[in-house]
Amino acid sequence: MTSAIGNKDMAAPQRVAALNRPNMVSVGTIVFLSQELMFFAGLFAMYFTSRANGIGNGSWKEGAHHLNVPYALVITIILISSSVTAQFGVFAAERGDVFGVRRWFSLTILLGAIFLVGQAYEYFHLVEHGMTIQSSVYGSSFFITTGFHAAHVLAGALAFVVVLLRLSKSKFTPAQATAAMVVSYYWHFVDVVWIGLFITIYFIQ
């Protein structure tokens, strides 16, 4: 009995170590996110260059006039909230709480979907007012930057779906906990990028 208790005591630290120690998946994710950061840095540079040219000829202000800032703020809050739910999902994964992971990640997917639908509605509204990707430099800059970000949100939501599908088909393992953490890293990154885009596009204009 003493031996069994000793083995049980040793198992817990090993399980925690398996969840917390650096691994190639996490390192690879950090490298990938660094590349994504450079990609979005390029988009920001393109946006500000276009802005400088547009302000010079007076076309930029006309395009920004169509933006609905209060509406954009609402969908921004929704996306930021999804980052909170994603982190609660990670906490559940660290505890080995499969039900908690499913609940919080499902809510994250739902919030991400609401954000995407909200952005699609905004696109529809702008197109109705004559602003398209081909209508002006402002239109091109707006749709390219927000469109690429929306694609990343969609990719993140699909990654959460994959994590949930894997949970439904096998026992919960440290590898699955790592996958949950890695996807959350990506999701937090996408949310931070949107905050930067929101401030740049809707407030600085």
From Swiss-Prot:
Residues spanning the signal sequence: none
Membrane topology: Multi-pass membrane protein
Catalytic activity: 4 Fe(II)-[cytochrome c] + O2 + 8 H(+)(in) = 4 Fe(III)-[cytochrome c] + 2 H2O + 4 H(+)(out)
Transmembrane segments: 28-48, 72-92, 104-124, 142-162, 184-204
InterPro entries referenced in this protein's UniProt entry, alphabetically: Cyt_c/ubiquinol_Oxase_su3, Cyt_c_oxidase-like_su3, Cyt_c_oxidase_su3-like_sf, Cyt_c_oxidase_su3_a-hlx
Entry similarity comment: Belongs to the cytochrome c oxidase subunit 3 family.
Protein name per Swiss-Prot or TrEMBL: Cytochrome c oxidase subunit 3
Organism: Corynebacterium diphtheriae (strain ATCC 700971 / NCTC 13129 / Biotype gravis)
